[in-house]
């Protein structure tokens, strides 16, 4: 069975891994997933990720980040723009998520970036997901 939303699958795997207190999680790799993981790493939500190749298929393995007392660094991670309903936003219409404690991840003409970086560059785009 083919998968229609690879990004939602990645976000669900990360969310389930945090709920299960796993150290690592892996899933099939793609360019958009790598771009989203770059933003998550830059914002401090994950430790690191590596791309491995098995049987001519590339996989991404993500090292999850926990606090000293064992709390997950990601409390919520949700898909906003879906294949059936794309959500676009100008940067002036995008309010802070959880009083600027969380982030939106946007796909812009300048690449995938957080809402904080998009505010600096004054550019809007497709709202991929929100993370807190």
Curated annotation (Swiss-Prot):
Coiled-coil blocks: none
Superkingdom to which the source organism belongs: Bacteria
GO BP annotation list: translation
One Pfam match: Ribosomal_S8
UniProt entry keywords in alphabetical sequence: Ribonucleoprotein, Ribosomal protein, RNA-binding, rRNA-binding
GO molecular function, one term: rRNA binding
Cellular component, GO annotation: ribonucleoprotein complex; ribosome
InterPro entries from the UniProt entry: Ribosomal_uS8, Ribosomal_uS8_CS, Ribosomal_uS8_sf
Subunit structure: Part of the 30S ribosomal subunit. Contacts proteins S5 and S12.
Family the UniProt entry places it in: Belongs to the universal ribosomal protein uS8 family.
Main function: One of the primary rRNA binding proteins, it binds directly to 16S rRNA central domain where it helps coordinate assembly of the platform of the 30S subunit.
This protein's name: Small ribosomal subunit protein uS8
Species this chain originates from: Rickettsia canadensis (strain McKiel)
The organism's taxonomic lineage, starting at the top: Bacteria, Pseudomonadati, Pseudomonadota, Alphaproteobacteria, Rickettsiales
Gene expressing this chain: rpsH
